[in-house]
């Protein structure tokens, strides 16, 4: 049994199906979940430190494989978009650092050249050079989740209801929930982990994020992801883009704010000579962990309770690899990555009954 069908639950289902395992999903289908609102970007490079993103060499092949398989399974040919990520370079000092990175091969195979001058397009002056990141892209995440939800419903594998933790019974042979029974349950409820009486001790540090849907004046090409303290990438509508995202830790609600909208527009308009019309504003809470790593594994007391959560801001990139790892852990006694294993928090945060 899987609780939650966000990006984490989606990938769990996919890996369980590949392994030939049966399952059922329980989800309340919240319209404001972080997964449905997220941009779905994956980027193998951490621009601020000019390093590969954590485990990028493992995560990128895994996500490409998984999402291409979902394309075929759901008969949707536009879920995963491998788009180059355009990164302008604004100062001479920054250019020196990027050239050093290139010469050292620190970001191979994700960058292989630096172009002098501003990139093509409606960019304002002030760029000394630019580079393009390969093997990045984005997933049409809302489209993927909704299509997979429909697939599960048609096959009788989806129960739409709010989960009542008090109705979960742990038995010698597995778990029982109302009229459902299973060998185990995997909790993938995203930010709603705070309501979970079994895993509420895990140190999550949720963040609020806001994203905009904007219409442009037609001067932006829809063949890349624009990145310069913001992310701007195309939707399936002509001249309509997604612009994100903000980070807020104090006010944790799902209400878009004028301040966040203005912040995003200001960042984009500082770089681009383009008129942006806001069509929609959305906000959600991301299930991030204090150390910015996913948290997966088995409950220290109940061997039939598992956690797959904490995908945070990089869920699209992280979830495929670790979903496969968790499935292997459960069924084939595979190992869990130490940096992602739930056990890393036992000593300081878990109190035994």
Language model: regions and residue ranges:
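Short hydrophobic core segments
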Residues: 1-3, 180-192, 323
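Hydrophobic/small residue at the entry helix of a nucleotide-binding pocket
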Residues: 7-8
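Active-site substrate-recognition segment that forms the wall
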Residues: 11-19, 28, 36, 41, ...
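Conserved beta-strand positions in the Rossmann-like core of class I SAM-dependent methyltransferases
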Residues: 24
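Dinucleotide-binding Rossmann-like beta1-alpha1 core, especially the glycine-rich loop
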Residues: 41-121
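Short beta-strand to alpha-helix junction loop
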Residues: 50-62, 92-93, 131-147, 255-260, ...
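Helical element adjacent to the flavin cofactor pocket in flavoenzyme catalytic cores
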Residues: 131-184, 188
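C-terminal catalytic lobe of FAD-dependent flavoproteins
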Residues: 280-353
